[in-house]
Structures are given as C-alpha cells and as structure tokens.
Amino acid sequence: LRNDEVERLKKFPIFNLGKYKGGCIVLKSNKRVKPYGMLANRTVGYAVENEGKKSILVGIEGAFNTYLKGQNGQMLMEKIRGNEWKPVENELSVEPVPGSDVYTSIDVNLQDVAESALLKQLKDQKAQKGCAVLMEVKTGFVKAIANLSFDTETETYFEAQNHAVGLASEPGSTFKLASLLVALEQGKVKITDSVDMTGRYDFYDNYLTDGGKVYGRNTIKVAFEKSSNVISQIIYDNYKKDPQEFIDGLKEIGIHQKLGLSILGEGTPFIKESTDPTFTGITLPWMSIGYELKMTPLQTLALYNAVANEGILLKPQFVRYIKKGSEIQKYFKPEILNTSICSKSTLNDLKAMLEGVVERGTANNIKARGFKIAGKTGTSKIAQGSKGYGNKYQASFCGYFPAKNPMYSCIVVVQGPTKNIFGSVVSGSVFKEIADKVYAQEFKKENIAVEDSINQYPYSRNGDKESFLIASRKIGIPVNDLSSNTTQWISTRTGNNGIKIITKENKKGLVPNVIGMGLIDATYILEKYGLLVQPVGSGIVREQSIRAGFKLYKGQKIVLQLG
C-alpha cells in the first residue's frame, strides 16, 4: 500500500483502535518505482552509496545524487517493554532534510518514439546494440536518448550501457563533415571544385574504394552527397606535406575534447597527432573518412548540431532545473563550448551538402513529406583489437530537421547489423521514423495552439458522450456529432462553429488513450481493462505512463499525470 492509502486504512473501524486493540501493524519499506518502465533507464540511472566503499553513481541520479538524497536525521531512542523502541526528544535530535527534485529535459513521449523505432530496427536487423539521441538544436537539451543491447541469455534487448555517452568508436563517413569543414575553412578547396571519382584511391600499398561504384568527374559537393571516398584523396593531396595542419584544424572545432557532460562515463575522443609513433603514410586519408580516430555518438551529434545552430557548439544537457518545494535551486541554461566552429560561408556550404545527401545522395530513401531532412550516412567496419577489422559493421546516420530553421538534431548508431550494413537503410530509416513522428507532433501542437487562440467556445474534455451532450445542451453550445450512435466514449475538438465530437476507439488487448479525459472517466476505462490507476496532481489527464496502443497486461500500474 502507498502511504496515503495506509493513512486512510487507519481510519477504518477496528483498524482505528491502534496497534494492540485493532491489530493494525504497519511495516514501512522503501521501493524504487519506475512509472515509465525501462524508458531511458540507463540515462535516468541510480545511486548506491556504500559506507567505507566507493559509491556506484550512474546516469542523472548518480550525477545529481547530492541534491536528491537530502540529509539523514538523528534521534535518541529508548528501548521499552516488548522489545520496542520509542523516540526520546532532546537537544541532540536532528530533523532529516528531504532531498530536492531534479527535472530532466527528457520528454516521455519523444523518448517512447525514439526507443520504439530503435528497438524495431534492432530486432529486424538482429543487431548487437544501438542508440538514438534527439536534441534541441538551439539549447542542447536532450529530449530523448535510447540505448539498447542484445542479451544472449534472454534473447531480448534492454538498457545495459549508455552507448551514446560512453561508446567511443571509429565513426566512419559521418566524420567526412569535419574533414571538409577544415579543408573549406582553411581555403584548401571549394565545394564547386571538380574531382574524379574513379572508384579506387591508392595510398602506398593500400587503397580505398567506393564499393565498386564509379561516379566519374563531378564536384566535391556531389562527392560528399554520394559519400565517395575521393574525399580521402582530397585531404591527402592538400595536407600530405603538413598533416598537423589538418589535425590542428580539427582541434580548433573542439572535437578532440570531451563535452564535459553532467553524467559520468563519457568516452574519450581520440584524434591522432602527427607525432604519434603509429601515424603512418595512410593515417591521414584514413582519418579523413572516420578511421584511426574515435568519437562517441553524442560527440558526433554535438558537431552536427553546431552546423544546424549557426556554428555554435553546445554542451548536451539532461537536466533543466532542480527544485526544492516551490523554490528553484538551480536553473540550467544552454552552455556554449565554441561560439563559432567556422565562418558563415563554410557553414552555408556544409548545410547545402547535408541537404543534398538526403535530396539526391546516399540517404534519398529517407526524404520526408512536408519538411526537409539534412544529414550524413556512415558505414564503418568495427575493429576487433589485435585481430584487425572483421566482418562487423557500424551503421549510422546523423543530421537535423527541418533543414530550414532546424528544431532538432538526431543521431542513430547501430552496431552489428546482420541483414544490411548501410547507414542509410539501417540507421537512416530509424532517423526518418523519429523525425516524421516528432515533426507531426510539433506541427500538431502549433496548429492546435493557433486554432485554440481563435475559438469562441470553451475547451471540452474527452470522455463520456451522454454526460457531454447533457452539459452542452444546458449551456447552449452547438455540437457537431460525428460519433457512432452506439459509442460511449468520445474525443472533442473545439472550433469556431461549436464543438465537434468523434468516436474514441479503444482496441481490445491494448492500453486505451485517456489523455484529455477527467479522472473519473479515465479511471473507469482503465480499471475496466484491468489496470491499476495512480493519479498524480489534479485536473484532466495530460500524460499516461503507458502509451496508448501498447500491449495490455492486467494488474499493471499506470500513472496519470493531471493538470
């Protein structure tokens, strides 16, 4: 039982007689409850404090444990008859101090979209692991972050590690953006320069190919759009006499350093210096296409977000503010790591190339309706330590949307896909699903806001049809009834000409949608389906912890956020 339920129970007959006469003995225990299940589980994290030993601090909870845990109290206790203890009031007593509340930037609905899209693709590809991150372009606040790994014992995917934060690997072709940024900024090339994409590029006794394709002579812009490895030749020809100039250009962006994330475990980026003993004649061309260096998915996303954000490199953040009672203790503002990663002209060139990748290049399979996506595909072999490169691949797509006035940046990385290895197919399709659903949701919000601002009739709750019709007749509101004659539950939409009502369908075996309903109607429907309802707040239902349409399990708890 919850604490409020126990207090109500104590007032019942017999139970109100106390411990000895009524037999009501309450045993208290603390239980960690996750109303949203496994959503963002690793990023939300946990904290385990062991006296005399090193504490285990994971994710947001681990990072902000000093705020969350509060302070323990202290009280003198006296042992009395029956092996019981009673408190003794004295000046040594110290009242415990409750912890603060940490408000994250993660949007539950967007998190569900990202996690569902990633999980579906990992299952389809029978991949080893993957991650997807969605971030606000203008602020750097992370709105969704999904990390899934395959468990060979249970044959299911779960959140075991924060790959987006901690997995530093060779990014592959998504790094070509950084390579051309440096070459453009240092005046070595223009995107209109002509290059010959022969399909094979030799460096000493090694070579790179375009996967059997020959694109012929065209511009650097087209080479980027096609993800041709002629870019390795371009970088090599311009920097072979002074490789450190190229490396210094990368360091000026800031991608050689950690982002300084609030949560622990950020992977260390690795950009090889020209003085490194392992720097060989082929290091420069290999680096230019994302090998012989390492970056985490979140570090790559920060770079692409900077392009979308007019050159401003932001620190990704997970917490908006910390609150104690009604007082905000700490408010987190966007944090700038680099005010300008490049000039305006270079920025415009980069944007044009990223848009071209989706419009005409390797990611033309993810073109969206109603808005444009900009981004870059990446496919790289995964190094197997001393064994070299085997047949394991990493597929990725990083970009932002909409291409004009971007709202969100996003990266999807999948390791060990078995059916397809290309970033456009494996990760690009996940990116597109996230972008489509997020954009539709944001566009819907904007439309509703405009519509509501010009309506002359009041907002109406979703819920019981008969109750709604009685109320609307009493106050004289015109109703456009588009629902079926037999339906009990309706959705409403307020307009200039009155209120339109339609049938609210609840499919058997799936969690119903009760958002927009009053608590009484919502509770009636959910309990009818066998769910245990826990309301939080007052007003109408704004959020439900189990998304509508998910498979229903009787006895499962669902939290309703009211407002």
What are these regions, as identified by a protein language model?
Residues 3-4, 34, 54-58, 96, ...:
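Soluble non-cytosolic domains of exported or imported proteins
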Residues 17-26, 124, 194, 260, ...:
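Short, well-structured beta-strand/strand-turn elements
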Residues 1-98, 411-412, 429:
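Small/polar-residue-rich segments within soluble enzyme cores
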Residues 92-102, 331-332, 499-510:
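Acidic/histidine-rich, surface-exposed loop or edge segments in extracytoplasmic proteins
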Residues 79-93, 130-172, 178-416:
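Beta-lactam-recognizing serine transpeptidase/beta-lactamase-like catalytic domain environment
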Residues 86-130:
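Conserved, well-ordered alpha-helix/loop/beta-strand core segments that scaffold catalytic motifs
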